[in-house]
Amino acid sequence: MFADLDYDIEEDKLGIPTVPGKVTLQKDAQNLIGISIGGGAQYCPCLYIVQVFDNTPAALDGTVAAGDEITGVNGRSIKGKTKVEVAKMIQEVKGEVTIHYNKLQADPKQGMSLDIVLKKVKHRLVENMSSGTADALGLSRAILCNDGLVKRLEELERTAELYKGMTEHTKNLLRAFYELSQTHRAFGDVFSVIGVREPQPAASEAFVKFADAHRSIEKFGIRLLKTIKPMLTDLNTYLNKAIPDTRLTIKKYLDVKFEYLSYCLKVKEMDDEEYSCIALGEPLYRVSTGNYEYRLILRCRQEARARFSQMRKDVLEKMELLDQKHVQDIVFQLQRLVSTMSKYYNDCYAVLRDADVFPIEVDLAHTTLAYGLNQEEFTDGEEEEEEEDTAAGEPARDTRGAAGPLDKGGSWCDS
């Protein structure tokens, strides 16, 4: 239909400038340059690049991009031709092919419309839904096949729970060891006092030796705490810095991923709209005026895909490094814990083995039960006070028969 009008329809460029240019591409072994073409007669006055495939001559060269208009092939104009005819023209050329183009100077911000933002929000909501739930709510579900980062994220959450549990358990363990060391210290102080006050030399030496053993155990406990405490610092660094940093990177990755999926969905909707109108014989205004809106979305999709690929690569590398650190760090920390506790128990066993002083012989009769001339009778302070109160409150009575001091024969004498 545009052949009859000689393409005199004014193009609606939406304020997007174009810059002409040309590029020479060396074809690959399959005689391809790695682009797909859209537009052309009979509904669109221009032909444009829909997609540049990865690892192809066009992608490696980087000159042309999605949305750029193709104006000629090897100096031959393609005006009024269909996309199939232009594809054949490119295929007929062997070796190098020169593509003449009009570079679309598009700003990605122009493509970030409210529709794209709403699509990103919808993708966030649908991401964690099952297929059945999404279908029941009437929501289309655009997903990336074989997206292993979803499983990696689940593994990261499990690793975070593991480190959190290890941190709490280690804190409780250190607290228990600290209280145990204080108990050993108290034991040592008590036995040391007993040893100092014990009149029997052998028993005194035994109590002091047993006290020193408990004080040594207390020192072993403090040494254990100083050795294991850095383990908490390392675990907290991994738990509170490395994992949150990876989560933040994953959130950025998901944002780029949802943006890319939103542009893909937008392109699909615009394609369906165009096919429906063509089927009805009513071409769209945007198509008949150069399809610049569609080409802008194509450019935005390509740039979003590039950001998505780069971000995905960065996330995979970071998670790989995090996994390696997790494997190495967890082994090192557990070895430190086990070796430190083993040394602690071995040292405690060695000290207590050398301090095997039981049974201890103590002359209780000599120390607490024997009464002699030079020993004072044991009296309780409270009983003395009661006796004084009684003596003050009662009248004087005959003291005959009252208990007197012990004589040399050990018998009581009258006063």
UniProtKB/Swiss-Prot annotation:
Membrane topology summary: Peripheral membrane protein; Lipid-anchor
Domain of life: Eukaryota
Location(s), subcellular: Cytoplasm, Perinuclear region; Membrane; Postsynaptic density; Synapse, Synaptosome
Keywords: Actin-binding, Calcium, Cytoplasm, Cytoskeleton, Lipoprotein, Membrane, Metal-binding, Palmitate, Phosphoprotein, Synapse, Synaptosome, Zinc
One term under GO cellular component: postsynaptic density
Lipidation (S-palmitoyl cysteine): 413
Residue list for modification Phosphothreonine: 82
Residue ranges constituting the PDZ domain according to the UniProt record: 22-105
Post-translational modification: Phosphorylation at Thr-82 appears to inhibit the interaction with AMPA receptors.
Binding-site list for Zn(2+): 44, 46
Entries under PROSITE patterns matching the protein: AH, PDZ
Classification via InterPro entries: AH/BAR_dom_sf, AH_dom, Arfaptin_fam, PDZ, PDZ_sf, PICK1_BAR
Main location: cytoplasm
GO BP annotation list: cellular response to decreased oxygen levels; cellular response to glucose starvation; dendritic spine maintenance; dendritic spine organization; glial cell development; intracellular protein transport; long-term synaptic depression; negative regulation of Arp2/3 complex-mediated actin nucleation
Residue stretches of biased makeup (Acidic residues): 377-391
Gene3D superfamilies with a match to the protein in the record: 2.30.42.10, Arfaptin homology (AH) domain/BAR domain (1.20.1270.60)
Keyword Phosphoprotein: yes
Function of the protein: Probable adapter protein that bind to and organize the subcellular localization of a variety of membrane proteins containing some PDZ recognition sequence. Involved in the clustering of various receptors, possibly by acting at the receptor internalization level. Plays a role in synaptic plasticity by regulating the trafficking and internalization of AMPA receptors. May be regulated upon PRKCA activation. May regulate ASIC1/ASIC3 channel.
Domain text: The AH domain mediates binding to F-actin. The unoccupied PDZ domain is probably involved in allosteric modulation by forming an intramolecular bridge with the AH domain leading to a 'closed' formation. Binding of a PDZ ligand, such as GRIA2, allows enhanced interactions with F-actin and the Arp2/3 complex thus enhanced inhibition of actin polymerization.
Protein name: PRKCA-binding protein
Organism: Pongo abelii
Record gene name: PICK1
